[in-house]
């Protein structure tokens, strides 16, 4: 039993970072996960929630400050404030160091291997004005807002500093909104705007034009697209580099969305090659079919990966970019059964990537490359790109 109650304020020494963006502290040998703190600090922590084994809290007063602490650029980034950013009080360089620690820890604990990955920063290097997709809640007062951490409480805002400039200059922040339906805002690489509510465009264009590495994608606002304005280009570069694609290769693009990776790969494999895009989302599939309607070396499969992959034969390279919970054992086993010469895995969660990496290593695949990309500055989230090749029996 925990001897803490919600609302208690305790003084704690702040320990190491944990997966999920909290820092670990202890009170009478009981673990407390703390937000708004940094390793090495001493803080007064207000307990915000409790479960059977753990307590969670916010550092509401810093008694001993870390040299890595900075003033949060956003006025809403504070205990009890907006829950979107959890690293605004930490310098950019240290944010990346913490993300490296998180990746290393997950691979040590789950995959049982030691790694030393680079975590690279991405323009804009200030960590602000990078987010091209933003969902806004509506408060009881009819104002735009974002949710407090793990809460239904809406924190009213008139700007979001991690959002791109066009979102912040939009009129949506200055209007009164009726009802509870959320607003979804999107800005393309071509600076086109869409504001969507209840599935309908209420401001801007119905479709957005994205240009990535000389490939053009016309996408609907409900289709998945990377949030960081510069993420698509960087991810394409890393995936192409690690996959080592050649003319005539046969490739699978799993969880392929609208075809971010399919478009450049189709050019590299040429008419003698073939790429299979598998995606279950209706909006993404609709967009992908339009984008690639005249491409004979692209085959689109609408459905779950675990149902479609088994039917595709003679695949040499597999690219996968699954949701946060990863591909999982069933899909990874299907990938292994295909015996691809190389696998490139894009992941937004180090824990699920480490879990799936363990399965691949146990089945004769070698982890050759792993890099962290800081595509979510001011938050604990980090994108990873990993590549694997099948070990050759001697």
Question: What role is predicted for each listed range?
Answer:
Residues 28, 51, 138-143, 149-151, ...:
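Short acidic-glycine loop/turn motifs at beta-strand connectors
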Residues 30-33, 151-154, 200-202, 225:
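Short, surface-exposed beta-strand-loop junctions and turns on beta-sheet-rich folds
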Residues 45, 136-138, 181-193:
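Broad, structure-driven detector of short, well-ordered beta-strand segments within folded domains
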Residues 25, 40, 85, 349, ...:
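Residue-level signal for inorganic ion chemistry
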Residues 1-78, 151:
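Terminal RNA-binding accessory module
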Residues 2-13, 19-20, 177-179, 188-394:
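Rossmann-like S-adenosyl-L-methionine
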Residues 60-75, 79-180:
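Extended interfacial segments that mediate partner engagement and assembly in macromolecular machines
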């Amino acid at each position: 039993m925990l001897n803490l109650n919600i609302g208690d304020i305790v003084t704690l020494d702040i320990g190491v970072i944990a997966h999920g963006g909290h820092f670990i502290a202890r009170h009478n040998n009981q673990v407390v996960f703390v937000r708004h703190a940094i390793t090495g600090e001493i803080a007064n922590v207000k307990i915000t929630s409790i479960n059977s084994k753990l307590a969670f809290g916010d550092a509401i007063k810093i008694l001993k400050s870390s040299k890595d602490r900075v003033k949060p650029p956003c006025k809403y980034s504070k205990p009890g404030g907006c829950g979107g950013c959890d690293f605004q009080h930490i310098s950019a360089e240290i944010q990346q160091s913490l993300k490296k620690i998180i990746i290393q820890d997950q691979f040590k604990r789950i995959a049982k291997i030691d790694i030393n990955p680079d975590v690279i920063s991405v323009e804009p290097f200030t960590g602000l004005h990078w987010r091209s997709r933003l969902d806004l809640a509506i408060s009881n007062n009819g104002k735009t807002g974002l949710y407090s951490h793990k809460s239904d409480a809406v924190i009213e805002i008139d700007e979001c500093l991690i959002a791109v400039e066009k979102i912040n200059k939009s009129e949506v922040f200055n209007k009164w909104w009726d009802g509870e339906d959320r607003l979804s805002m999107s800005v393309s690489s071509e600076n086109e705007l869409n504001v969507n509510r209840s599935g309908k465009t209420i401001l801007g264009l119905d479709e957005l034009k994205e240009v990535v590495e000389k490939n053009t994608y016309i996408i609907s606002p409900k289709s998945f697209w990377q949030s960081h304005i510069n993420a698509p280009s960087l991810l394409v570069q890393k995936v192409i580099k690690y996959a080592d694609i050649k003319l005539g290769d046969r490739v699978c693009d799993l969880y392929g969305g609208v075809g971010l990776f399919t478009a450049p790969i189709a050019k590299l494999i040429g008419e003698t090659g073939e790429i299979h895009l598998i995606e279950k989302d209706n909006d993404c599939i609709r967009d992908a079919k339009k984008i690639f309607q005249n491409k004979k070396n692209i085959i689109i499969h609408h459905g779950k990966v675990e149902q479609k992959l088994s039917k595709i034969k003679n695949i040499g390279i597999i690219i996968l970019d699954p949701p946060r919970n990863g591909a999982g054992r069933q899909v990874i086993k299907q990938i292994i059964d295909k015996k691809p010469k190389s696998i490139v895995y894009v992941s937004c969660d180090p824990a699920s990537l480490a879990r799936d990496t363990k399965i691949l290593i146990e089945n004769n695949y070698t982890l050759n490359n792993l890099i962290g990309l800081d595509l979510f500055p001011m938050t604990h989230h980090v994108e990873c790109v990993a590549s694997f090749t099948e070990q050759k029996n001697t």
